[in-house]
Structures are given as structure tokens and as C-alpha cells.
Amino acid sequence: MNRETSRELYDRSLDVLVGGVNSTVRAAPQPYPTFVQSGDGGHVIDADGNRYIDWVMGLGPLLLGHDLPQPVTAAIQRRASDGPLFGTPTEIEVEHAEFVARHVPSVELLRFVNSGTEATVSAVRLARGYTGRNKIVVMQGGYHGAQESTLVEGDADHRGPSSAGIPPAFAQHTIPVPFNDADAVTEVFETHGDDIAAVLVEPILANKGIVEPVAGYHETLRDLTHDHGALLIWDEVITGFRVGGLGCAQSEFDITPDVTTFGKIIGGGFPVGAIGGRTDVMEEFTPTGDVFQAGTFSGHPVTMAAGLETLQYAAENDVYEHVNRLGGRLREGLAAVVAEHAPAYTVVGRDSMFKVVFTRDGDAQSGACTDGCRQDPDCERHAACPKTGADVGDAAVQRWNRVFRPQLLDAGVLLSQNQFESQFVSYGHTEADVDETIEAYRSAL
């Protein structure tokens, strides 16, 4: 497959863009990134004219695929023609907030921002302002954007910034614990409970191999935060309006967080973020409270139109039935391939998310786990399935970067840029896309 134009564009980009990209993960593919020219349905076409089945889907925002339905396209065009920006409130942002609050029971008030990172930055500031405390608890391997408060690694006793440029003092207020380790987080609350403003957690470790929670873990976090007067913040930037449909992952896991952060799908493919939660907490934001939060582009009318029309289309059509069914078919098909050719590997995912983690131990998945690991304690390979971010990190291999992903690319299948990011099914994907992808995995494995 000829990718000479992508190579030339990457060479040019290295002269004017840092590392040749505008987001670090885009530089991960070997030996250079694929430059995409356009998309249609569940496919993208690169700068050389090569067509790929696209399971990246913009890293998650494109629930409907690359061909937006006519009502969504019309709403975007109509808002853009009205004018690019006003710096005033608009009706469309009210309508979008009403839709979210109507479908996500934990959300009473909402504040739109411009990215998932901005949402989590604001949520952490909100929690500190509301509680008058400084410390937050995060999960090892969890991802909450490029922000100082969460770019922290280590454990409760030994921690520090995970990036240059962050003062070590930030890490003193952030306590990382292993996902799914109830004893570890309980011990942290026993030691620091009066100083903890919030626990910030993804319902699923969606940026680190799609790690499912073990039974009772989220209930433990809910109880600990409630008992110690801390806030439970769910980061649904990835899972929101994908896992659990319009009710989001919190409806699927039956947990009511105090605050939720959103992004990706609620913008319909345009830059977006949001913070939603209980009225008494959310009203700590200015202008009703003392926690400052503002943004020139927040509630941008084009983004609001794209996001609202996307969610309305999903509500009125068979979008979730379609993407979840194809997601299930993918996971079951990949589980069969893995059982035959690489039984130590683990198929993970839920609803319209999927991934194969290159774990090194364990028998082939069977029973309930053929639809993706569910942390079933009765499963014979329960001990081998990833339960923490570290487990997924231990499964990282050069084979994925240098052999497996390039081979899938040559077969016309575009996977996530690294072996940790999730892959996503869209409304634009077809049964044929699923069949072709399963066969590409079979050939590569």
C-alpha cells in the first residue's frame, strides 16, 4: 500500500509543528502517522487515496460516523450561517443543557466548556472550592486530560509529576491509587479523609485498555466520599453518551456521582466539554458562587447545534442498538480469533468500545467474557485479566507498535494510535466492516 504522500506530509510537518503533530498521541504510529484527507460512513481516506475501516472515530466523538445525517448537517450549517460567535448566551445552549439534564439524572445544572481537559480542570477546582479541601484521589492509569492536578504518577506514599514543567508541590495534593483496589482507597481515606476534596474516576479505565470495574468497587468509592464529605466526580468524557446510551455509564452501573465531566460525543465532532452535577455543588461556580470559571468559546453555537442534533438523532433512531450490536459482534469474533491464535490475549470492551490487550498469561476467554472481560470472579482466567492500569501497561509490547498495527493498516483497518486507547464503533459502520476487521485480526495474529 502506497503511503508516500503521508510520509512527505509528515516530513513537512516536522518543520513547522512540534513533533509534526498537534496532539502527542498522533505521533505514535510507526514509522509515521497516516494523514487523513476525508471520511465517509465508517471509513477514512488518507492523503494517498487509500481507504481504511476507521475504528479510531476521532478518538471517540463520532458516534454517528463520518457521514452526518441530514438533520445534523443542516443544524450545523444553519448555526454557522447565523454568525460564528456572539459572546452572549444563545437559545441552543439552553436546549442542549435541557437535553442532557433530562437524560442524565445526576445532572441538575450544567456548564459547557471547550474540551474534556477543561472540564476536568474546572471540576477539580469546583470540588476544592465547594469542600474547602485540597487533595484529590485519582486512579493509576486513569486519564483526565493534560492538566497539572492529574498528571501525577506513583502511589499514595511516593508520588510525583508525570510530566516535566509541573511543580512537585502539585503532586502533594493528588493521591494516585490502583483502580479496583478497594483496600488501597479505603486506607487513603483513613489517612487523609478530612483533606480529600474529591475522587476523580472514570467508570471504566477507557484510556488504558478498557479496564472494567470489579463488583462493588464504584459502590465503595460512593460510600467513602459520602462518609467523608468528599465529592465523587465521574469522568465520562469518553463513556458519556456511549456506554449506557443516553443515560451514560452511570446509568449502566447504577451510581449517582456528585459531579460528571463530559466531552467528545456531546459536541458532535466539534470541540467541547461540560461539567454537570448537583445544584448545590454547581452553584459554587461564578457568577452564583466563588469558583471562577469562564471561556470565550464556551457554549459555541455551532458546537451546541452539532451536539444536540447528534444526541436527538440517537434518541429518535436505532443508533445505540446498531453500534452496541456491532460492538458485541466484534468482541465475540475477536475472542474466537484470540482463543485460536493467541489465547493469552484479552478482549475487552463494552457497548460500542473494543480492544485486544496483549496480556501474557491465562487461558482463552470463555463464557461471559466472550463479549469482553467483565471481571467475573467465576471466570477461570479471572486472575489473568487486567484489573489496573499497571496490568495493561505490563501488556505493552513492541510487537503491537511495530508489527501488529502496521499489518492491520496494510489490510485496510485503522486502529488506535497506541495500544492503550480504546477503539470505537459508529453508526456508519457495517456488518461487512466487522467481518473484514475480524479476518484482518485473524491474519495478523
Curated annotation (Swiss-Prot):
Q: Its domain of life? A: Archaea
Which CDD domains does this UniProt record tie to the protein? OAT_like (cd00610)
Q: Which UniProt keywords apply?
A: Cytoplasm, Isomerase, Porphyrin biosynthesis, Pyridoxal phosphate
A single BP term in Gene Ontology: protoporphyrinogen IX biosynthetic process
What is its EC class?
Answer: isomerase
Q: Which reaction is catalysed here? A: (S)-4-amino-5-oxopentanoate = 5-aminolevulinate
Which cofactors does this gene product need? pyridoxal 5'-phosphate
Matching entries from PANTHER family are given as: GLUTAMATE-1-SEMIALDEHYDE 2,1-AMINOMUTASE (PTHR43713), GLUTAMATE-1-SEMIALDEHYDE 2,1-AMINOMUTASE 1, CHLOROPLASTIC-RELATED (PTHR43713:SF3)
Protein name, entry field: Glutamate-1-semialdehyde 2,1-aminomutase
* UniProt organism field: Halobacterium salinarum (strain ATCC 700922 / JCM 11081 / NRC-1)
Question: Lineage in the entry?
Answer: Archaea, Methanobacteriati, Methanobacteriota, Stenosarchaea group, Halobacteria
